[in-house]
């Protein structure tokens, strides 16, 4: 349910899900073929059959996350990243030994990757040009005034929910809660959530459907609208439908809304307007290219 903002997985940029598998942890995990040294001269962090692994091997991560800095990582994080690079190099060497890089399938895959990389590189260059554009102060101020209530008000709610497949199931659960005295409604809600919810996170945790705290934009629109309309200690008397199914929502608490000032919101506004300008320029440029290209669509 909740749209968690996740940190970039450091090793994610280096390998496929196969390579991401954790190595077995045992006393012999560092085999006799693996030597640890303190020699990191010339930026060489490790070698695999003579091939050096350097900080530049992690440039792909920096492209995705500009804040990435290998030198600022904790020692265990560095070791994990280096180990992942070693695992990748080992498999790469094995693939070359098997001459997989000479197969038609691999060559076709590389062509597809090159095409996609070229498109992304072109788009990156366009984005860099857009960042140089100064967004007028008045345009940012007007955007803030027009969108203040929707985008720049922070308010968190803490709620529970029960998710079921059908509206009839949801109505039955609401009816069961309705029968309870006020002092016992939340306890009944927790009991029914643990028993009936199809939300896998809640079901596995057996936490009474506790979603923790969330903001409006972190939930499906209809869910947020219903949740934030409640008062603490109250629950939805009619099922709330979303793409996930039907919800019954119980509100535990709700913070008072806090509106960001223009100055606080300004960096976000600038980014949003730059993104809008980028999309407009991309569409405009592509239309120009379309006009000058010979395009044939076969039906």
UniProtKB/Swiss-Prot annotation:
Superkingdom of the organism of origin: Bacteria
Stretches assigned to the PpiC domain: 154-253
Signal peptide as annotated in the record: 1-21
PROSITE patterns membership: PPIC_PPIASE_1 (PS01096), PPIC_PPIASE_2 (PS50198)
Enzyme Commission number, as recorded: 5.2.1.8
GO molecular function: peptidyl-prolyl cis-trans isomerase activity
InterPro entries to which the protein is assigned, alphabetical: PPIase_dom_sf, PPIase_PpiC, PPIase_PpiC_CS, PrsA_foldase, Trigger_fact/SurA_dom_sf
SUPFAM superfamilies: FKBP-like, Triger factor/SurA peptide-binding domain-like
Keywords assigned: Isomerase, Rotamase, Signal
Pfam families noted in UniProt: Rotamase
Catalytic activity entry: [protein]-peptidylproline (omega=180) = [protein]-peptidylproline (omega=0)
Official protein name in the record: Putative peptidyl-prolyl cis-trans isomerase HP_0175
């Amino acid at each position: 349910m909740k749209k968690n903002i996740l940190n970039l997985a450091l090793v994610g940029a280096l390998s496929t899900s196969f390579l991401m598998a954790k190595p077995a942890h045992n006393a012999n995990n560092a085999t006799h073929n693996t030597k640890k040294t303190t020699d990191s001269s010339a930026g060489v962090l490790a070698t695999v059959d003579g091939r050096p692994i350097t900080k530049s091997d992690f440039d792909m991560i920096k492209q995705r996350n500009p804040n990435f800095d290998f030198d600022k990582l904790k020692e265990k994080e560095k070791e994990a990243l280096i180990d992942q690079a070693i695992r990748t190099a080992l498999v790469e060497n094995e693939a070359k030994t098997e001459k997989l890089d000479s197969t038609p399938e691999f060559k076709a895959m590389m062509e597809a990757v090159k095409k996609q990389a070229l498109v992304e590189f072109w788009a990156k260059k366009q984005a860099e040009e857009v960042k140089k554009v100064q967004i007028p102060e008045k345009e940012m101020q007007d955007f803030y005034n027009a969108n203040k209530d929707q985008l720049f008000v922070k308010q968190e709610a803490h709620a529970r929910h029960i998710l079921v497949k059908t509206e009839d199931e949801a109505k039955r659960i609401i009816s069961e809660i309705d029968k309870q005295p006020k002092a016992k409604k939340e306890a009944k809600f927790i009991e029914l959530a643990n028993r009936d919810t199809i939300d896998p996170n809640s079901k596995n945790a057996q936490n009474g459907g506790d979603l923790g705290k969330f903001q409006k934009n972190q939930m499906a629109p209809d869910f947020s609208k219903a949740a934030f309309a409640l008062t603490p200690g109250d629950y939805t008397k009619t099922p709330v439908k979303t793409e996930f199914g039907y919800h019954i929502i119980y509100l535990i608490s709700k913070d008072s809304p806090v509106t960001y000032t223009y100055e606080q919101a300004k960096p976000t506004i600038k980014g949003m307007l730059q993104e809008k300008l980028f999309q407009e320029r991309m569409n405009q440029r592509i239309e120009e290219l379309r006009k000058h290209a010979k395009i044939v669509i076969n039906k």
